[in-house]
Regions:
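N-terminal helix-turn-helix DNA-binding core of bacterial DNA-binding proteins
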Residues: 8-55, 66-68, 77-84, 107-109
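Charged, amphipathic alpha-helical coiled-coil/dimerization segments
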Residues: 59-105
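Amphipathic alpha-helical dimerization/coiled-coil segments
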Residues: 2-3, 10-14, 32, 88-109
Length: 109
């Protein structure tokens, strides 16, 4: 069974669309900030203090289109069920990548 084309992906493949989305600045930070509960756009801007409101709104729109984030009036933005599953599955790999990037490679002397 062939994969359906995915809007927003350069290749049309779902996994590549997800990687494209994750490669955009602030995407993972937004998901991480939403892990404990819903936040307003203002609270997210405070948590992501280097992001402009325009960039955050663009990332939130992409995350909503991907089905990872929901928006409820009066409650703010929160993770969808798929977003929670994704974060649970992805964060060990993300934590490993962060540790690996922080370690200094040894050079042969």
């Amino acid at each position: 069974m062939a994969d359906r084309p995915v809007r927003g992906s350069r290749t049309g493949r779902p996994i590549m669309a997800l990687l494209d989305l994750l490669g955009r600045r602030w995407t993972l930070r937004i998901l991480w900030e939403l892990r404990d509960g819903a936040l307003t756009a203002r609270a997210l801007r405070s948590a992501c203090d280097d992001a402009s409101p325009t960039v955050l709104q663009a990332r939130l729109a992409e995350l909503r289109a991907a089905g990872l984030v929901e928006h409820a009036a009066g409650r703010g933005y929160g993770l969808s069920e798929e977003g929670r599953e994704f974060l649970t599955a992805f964060m060990p790999l993300y934590a490993f990548a962060e540790r690996w990037a922080a370690s200094k490679p040894t050079t042969p002397g």
